[in-house]
Amino acid sequence: MRPIRVLVAKPGLDGHDRGAKVVAAALRDAGMEVIYTGLHQTPEMIATAAIQEDVDVVGLSILSGAHMTLFPRVLELLRAEDRGDILITGGGIIPKEDMDALHAMGTGRLFGPGTPTSELVSYIKAWFAEQSQQRA
């Protein structure tokens, strides 16, 4: 089976990327191909990179409080390009009620501060296995 391809992105003006780098390293250590976009990415830049890199998953790290704008915009841009099949997941400081609202809009599971990276790895692997079975 081919490796899972994941784009890890830091949208918006938030300059704190330590968590995103830790997540990227954990995903890489778990055998996934990881593309890290770096800081200050717009939703348009993220969607374009996801399509160009043909990723399975986009992971957004958002600590700025703009999650209710950024997650839906990335989803909208990917769906407009007929790539709604890409899993949008991520984390940051996101209240539970906002996580629920974002999930209802179409995001995958979202993770809060202190979540072990192994939990994210397991979630992505399980999602990918399920998608692979559905395509077979």
Where are these regions (language model features)?
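CheY-like receiver
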Residues: R135-A136
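Short, flexible coil/linker segments at domain boundaries that flank nucleotide/cofactor-interacting
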Residues: M1-P3, R83
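N-terminal pre-triad scaffold of radical SAM enzymes
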Residues: A9-L13
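Cofactor-cradling patches in redox/metallo enzymes
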Residues: A20-S122, W127-E130
